[in-house]
């Protein structure tokens, strides 16, 4: 999806709305197909279809306006917005008491494009206290607003960074980053067979491994957890 959204933006930068519309149509058909595969009841299929129609109508609106980096960031945010809504609907249909909390209302950067941790802490705790009692809380990764209230992104670390910021803001006991291997290993499993996970690392050691290429974790993800202890 992200590649398609980047492609849409590229077409619009090149003043080719027809090319952008073609990709938007392809992406909409893809997601409408997912609706048929994912949901069992017509009620939730229809609810999700209506949501998707609204989002893709919004995407098409960018083919008729002047296109800048601001619009590009809004378009790139749609992947997270669509996927988290679909997952939340799936959980609700399955009888799981889940709620979607909007990252664009909780995650903000300051004028230096760094996470505004005071704001993030205040908003995350507010939304959690206002919505207590749910089994599962879902939010978007990577996307945020900047100091001027515009849709933006965290630039580095992606969704992992968002998870660490929220975990630190809520003073969580544990932050889990799910990937294709179980933790940081004693060697790079892409090149060495039979590697073993390292059971315990200091923040500085984890940050150094990430900095020197441990793909499991972006170096910036260490800082929020270290800051909150």
Spans of model-derived segments:
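Nucleotide/pyrophosphate-binding catalytic subdomain
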Residues: 1-222
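Acidic-aromatic/histidine active-site loop/patch
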Residues: 225
């Amino acid at each position: 999806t992200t590649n398609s959204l980047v492609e849409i933006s590229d077409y619009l930068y090149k003043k080719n709305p027809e090319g952008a519309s073609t990709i938007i149509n392809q992406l909409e058909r893809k997601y409408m197909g997912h609706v048929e595969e994912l949901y069992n009841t017509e009620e939730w299929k229809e609810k999700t279809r209506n949501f998707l129609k609204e989002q893709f109508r919004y995407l098409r609106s960018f083919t008729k306006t002047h296109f800048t980096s601001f619009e590009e960031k809004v378009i790139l945010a749609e992947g997270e917005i669509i996927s988290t809504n679909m997952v939340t609907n799936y959980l609700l249909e399955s009888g799981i008491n889940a709620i979607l909390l909007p990252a664009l209302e909780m995650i903000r950067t300051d004028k230096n494009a760094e996470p505004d941790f005071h704001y993030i802490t205040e908003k995350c705790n507010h939304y959690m206290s206002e919505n207590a009692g749910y089994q599962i809380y879902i939010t978007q990764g990577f996307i945020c607003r900047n100091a001027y209230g515009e849709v933006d992104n965290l630039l580095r670390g992606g969704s992992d960074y968002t998870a660490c910021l929220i975990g630190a803001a809520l003073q969580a006991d544990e932050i889990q980053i799910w990937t294709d291997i179980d933790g940081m290993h004693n060697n790079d499993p892409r090149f060495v067979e039979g590697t073993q996970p390292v059971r315990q690392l200091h923040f500085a050691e984890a940050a150094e491994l990430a900095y020197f290429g441990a793909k499991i974790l972006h170096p910036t993800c260490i800082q929020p957890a270290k800051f909150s202890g």
